């Protein structure tokens, strides 16, 4: 193929696209479930969001930025996160069929979901320089992406929290797949903050 000067210039421009444009291309979904409870604010183009919540938060909220269709590609983030009650900083998403909700919990307040009496512990998985406790739980007739339904939750909870890094989510998907996770037909996938009690603040940048 003959490469014209105009095409070469376009190619060079594409290859040298600034980081903010790359963020815009990879981030195309805003998760905002009850975000008003956490004073949620965001800049989708810059890949940033923040929130704070106070004692007496009246309901669960889940907010974040990411992909409208999830994948097994790594996700990189950096955050300032502090929480005193029930809260997660996590890669969060859904699979359509079989319907499942998932969390790769990087940090949490005072509640580890794998410590729940209803959780089924599946062992550990090593990823990204750390060890994650893995468990599942079943939600019966609870809110979901299709309304009210019964579905499985998959959790990987990092032992020794972190608030920045790359999540090689394929490692978690592959482990979960041994226990019924669909590992395909993804719905949205975000870096999220969820909270339902206590107080906290978070400021997050998602870069991939």
UniProtKB/Swiss-Prot annotation:
The protein's enzyme class: hydrolase
N-terminal signal peptide: 1-16
EC nos: 3.2.1.8
Any one GO CC term of the record: extracellular region
Residue ranges occupied by any GH11 domain in the UniProt entry: 17-207
Principal location listed in the UniProt entry: secreted
Thermal activity profile: Optimum temperature is 50 degrees Celsius.
Active-site residue list: 101 (nucleophile), 194 (proton donor)
Pfam family, one: Glyco_hydro_11
Activity regulation details: N-bromosuccinimide completely inhibits the catalytic activity.
The keyword Secreted is annotated on this UniProt entry: yes
A molecular-function term among this protein's GO annotations: endo-1,4-beta-xylanase activity
Reactions this protein catalyses: Endohydrolysis of (1->4)-beta-D-xylosidic linkages in xylans
Keywords of this entry: Carbohydrate metabolism, Glycosidase, Hydrolase, Polysaccharide degradation, Secreted, Signal, Xylan degradation
One record GO biological process: xylan catabolic process
Pathway participation: Glycan degradation; xylan degradation
pH dependence: Optimum pH is 3.5.
Superkingdom assignment: Eukaryota
Family recorded in the similarity comment: Belongs to the glycosyl hydrolase 11 (cellulase G) family.
Function of the protein: Endo-1,4-beta-xylanase involved in the hydrolysis of xylan, a major structural heterogeneous polysaccharide found in plant biomass representing the second most abundant polysaccharide in the biosphere, after cellulose.
Protein name as it appears in the record: Endo-1,4-beta-xylanase B
